[in-house]
């Protein structure tokens, strides 16, 4: 059975709810075993992730408007520290952001900043707890990212 790891942080329960439903969807529809790592449970510990993973990050910002007056990430920085440690960023297939569209330009801004900071793609986004359509859409995106990564690993260069 193939496996995918979801590394996330959930503070209000919205992201945890989404990850649980996404995990069930991946298991039921793609026969994937999903390993979940909730950074909140680690109490600022880090360790090397040996397998490929997808990061899922809610948006918690302080100050600014996300366009011209800056912003400061709050509460979710342990996920960034975890990704930065032990070369974990190299095993991240990409990031999914969550947020509240009422915050306009700040919607999923932290995930966009992580994608730029670490050099992996922003795979998608969802609002608050996410909808069933978000679950199926992002499950497909995860499967495509995992397939691309797997095919890149198995490709060999021709002899020159």
Swiss-Prot record:
Signal sequence range: none
MF terms from GO for this chain are: FMN binding
This one is known as Putative NrdI-like protein
Q: Name one GO biological process term.
A: protein modification process
SUPFAM superfamilies hit by this protein:
Flavoproteins (SSF52218)
The family assignment reads: Belongs to the NrdI family.
Q: Quote the InterPro entries the UniProt record gives.
A: Flavoprotein-like_sf, RNR_NrdI
Entry superkingdom: Bacteria
């Amino acid at each position: 059975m193939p496996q995918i790891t979801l590394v996330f942080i959930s503070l209000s329960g919205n992201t945890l709810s989404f990850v649980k439903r996404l995990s069930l969807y991946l298991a039921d529809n793609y026969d994937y075993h999903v390993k979940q790592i909730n950074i909140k449970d680690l109490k600022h510990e880090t360790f090397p992730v040996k397998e490929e993973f997808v990061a899922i990050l809610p948006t918690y910002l302080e100050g600014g408007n996300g366009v011209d007056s800056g912003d400061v990430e709050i509460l979710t920085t342990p996920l960034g520290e975890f990704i930065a440690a032990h070369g974990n960023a190299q095993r991240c297939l990409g990031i999914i952001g969550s947020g509240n569209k009422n915050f306009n330009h700040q919607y999923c801004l932290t995930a966009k900043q992580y994608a730029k900071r670490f050099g992996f793609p922003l795979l998608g986004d969802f609002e608050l707890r996410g909808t069933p359509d978000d679950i199926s859409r992002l499950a497909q995106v995860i499967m495509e990212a995992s397939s691309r990564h797997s095919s890149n690993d198995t490709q060999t260069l021709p002899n020159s």
